A protein has these predicted regions:
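Arginine/glycine-rich "motif VI" loop of SF2 helicases in the C-terminal RecA-like domain
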Residues: 105-113
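Domain-level recognition of nuclease-like catalytic cores that cleave nucleotide substrates
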Residues: 109, 117-154
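N-terminal capping/linker segments that flank leucine-rich repeat
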Residues: 35-45, 137-138, 151-154
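Conserved catalytic cores of phosphodiester-cleaving nucleases, focusing on short active-site segments
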Residues: 24, 65-73, 77-96, 100-105
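A structural signal for isolated positions on well-ordered beta-strands in alpha/beta enzyme cores
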Residues: 84, 115-117
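Active-site metal-binding core of divalent-cation-utilizing nuclease and nuclease-like domains
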Residues: 36-79
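Amphipathic, low-proline, heptad-repeat alpha-helices and/or compositionally biased low-complexity charged/polar-rich
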Residues: 1-31
Length: 154
């Protein structure tokens, strides 16, 4: 049975995920032009083609479906189509970074270009290092941090 603190934490996480989903264009426009958060149906159509072609297994497809958000748009510098695989957590940890990377790699097997992104209110120092090592973009309170950014300077 969940404690009250666990329930509140779970609700806070769901609320944050919903905020990124509904305000996707505002948050992700710093990375992409023409941002669009994919609906479940749109994601299924994208992934099922790869599954039918044998590019993804059922388990790998499910892993992509478990992503918190998938966002489509055009890369700012050159307009190339790009997808973001976003893991949202109130407090982003290394597991969130690893999930974003794993799911972005799988999504590329559908034939699209995808980048991993983590988003939340705060990021642990270990997750910041992992994001830098794995080239994962970070969004904290709407602020975009590139994988190569030096966040050690305050």
């Amino acid at each position: 049975m969940q404690t009250l603190a666990e329930r509140v934490g779970s609700l806070h996480g769901e609320s944050l995920e919903q905020r990124y989903r509904t305000r996707g264009p505002a948050y992700f426009s710093r990375l992409l032009r023409g941002t669009h958060v994919l609906s479940s149906d749109e994601l299924v159509r994208l992934v099922e083609r790869a599954e039918e072609q044998g590019t993804l297994s059922d388990a790998e497809a499910q892993e992509i479906y478990d992503a918190d958000l998938v966002v489509r748009g055009r890369r700012r510098p050159d307009g190339a189509p790009l997808y973001l695989v976003v893991e949202v957590s109130v407090g982003v940890g290394t597991h969130d970074v690893e999930r974003a990377v794993r799911r972005a790699v799988l999504l590329t097997r559908t034939g699209v270009t995808a980048l991993p992104v983590v988003a939340g209110n705060w990021v642990t120092p270990e997750a910041t290092e992992a994001a830098r090592a794995y080239q994962v973009w970070q969004l904290t309170d709407g602020r975009v941090i590139a994988p190569s950014a030096d966040t050690s300077q305050g």
